[in-house]
């Protein structure tokens, strides 16, 4: 006895109370305003873009170069840091007067290369690494020169670097690349 107050009525189930209390549903929560999305600072965007460019540069270098050898065959050589160190060692062997040098192209067994072929491989590899390093440096200078997030976001690996951010070295590389492209066009026209 004493359970005479309807505490809560859920349709088929009725709860009673013995102290006269009545169920009061909790108040609806206040709507939660979603937080504003985080907007990185210009310095944070620049740091992130530099990391993106650095990674792309490393991938471009590591992908390596294809080299046409004296016999007319073309072989591809990856240029990871380990590969680059090996090639510097081969350069020392060349300086010492070695005429046949053991090395291997991607996915191939080790074989002997003539001093002339090894010189060609090393020259192309060093050019490839130096160009990409120089290009990456110019992109980083461009990133630092940006004054807005929009400017930073427009930069990507492979973009034409504005002249004001091109070093003397990059300009020389670009002239050489244009000349090589011109030679390819001439070769294609005469073929």
Identify what each model region corresponds to.
Residues 2, 7-191:
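A preference for well-ordered globular domain cores
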């Amino acid at each position: 006895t004493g359970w005479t107050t309807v505490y809560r009525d859920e349709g088929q189930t009725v709860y009673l109370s013995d102290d006269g209390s009545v169920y009061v549903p909790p108040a609806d929560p206040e709507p939660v305003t979603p937080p504003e999305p985080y907007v990185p600072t210009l310095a944070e965007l620049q740091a992130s873009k530099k990391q993106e460019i650095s990674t792309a540069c490393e991938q471009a270098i590591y992908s390596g170069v294809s080299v046409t050898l004296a016999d007319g065959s073309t072989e591809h050589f990856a240029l990871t840091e380990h590969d680059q160190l090996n090639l510097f060692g081969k350069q020392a062997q060349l300086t010492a007067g070695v005429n046949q040098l053991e090395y291997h192209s991607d996915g191939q067994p080790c074989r002997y290369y003539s001093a002339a072929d090894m010189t060609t491989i090393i020259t192309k590899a060093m050019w490839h690494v130096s160009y990409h390093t120089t290009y990456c440096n110019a992109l980083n200078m461009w990133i630092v020169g940006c004054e807005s997030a929009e400017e930073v976001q427009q930069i990507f690996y492979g973009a034409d670097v504005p002249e004001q951010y091109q070093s003397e070295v990059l300009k020389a590389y670009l002239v050489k690349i244009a000349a090589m492209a011109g030679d390819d066009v001439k070769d294609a026209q005469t073929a």
